[in-house]
Amino acid sequence: MSSRMRVYSATDVGKKREINQDYVFTSDIPVGHLPNLFVVADGMGGHNAGEYASSHGVMTLVEEITGDVEYNPVKVIRHAVEKANTWIFGKASQEESYSGMGTTMVVATIIGGFLYVANIGDSRLYVIDREIRQVTRDHSLVQEMVRLGEINADEARSHPKKNIITRALGAEKTVDVDFFDLKLTEESVVLMCSDGLSNMVEDRKIEEIVHRDDISLEEKGRELVREANNNGGKDNIAIILIEPFSSEVD
């Protein structure tokens, strides 16, 4: 199936930040016992600490998955996420310059038409087929406020506390990971992104761009980044677009 899979990924510093703390990893060939692997991470911390947390967190995750003898995708990803959490937390605890650093992380693999997803923080995974669906649930203060009925989804988008997350990799000694799985269709497109995209571009606009049939997957990805920057580019932007069952011919 990987031979039919099309992938586009990008990060962009945005319009307001000097350092890019977002990090992406993509592989449409096996990583350990997983047939493919896709990761988006959005780091946080002063100076270069956020950049360090996201990049080294992802590298630790990939290293662990590469060496894991387990075949169950959920167990493989859980082991690797826990190892990455331990590594970031340890580094932040031992070195003052890295104190308080952490990262969001959304991890995905596609096996036999099924999508397996792990999530910590407010980076997102969407599936777009007939309509757009957010698969992950944000671990954020405003999402909790929405859940409790204190604000609605539109108010959450512009809320002054929208950047406060309630869960992050490396923030504590142990990490609670959410897992999701679903069956993909021939029409499914998977979008993974940091909040630099989802806070800047509304879901319906994302859906509109992904549904365009006059441009390539790469052009759709570039258009999403462009749209985020045109709307203010207030944060770093990271995206991965995946067509698991592409019927295009080179």
Please report, for each region that a protein language model flagged, where it lies by residue.
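PP2C/PPM-type serine/threonine phosphatase catalytic domain
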Residues: 1-250
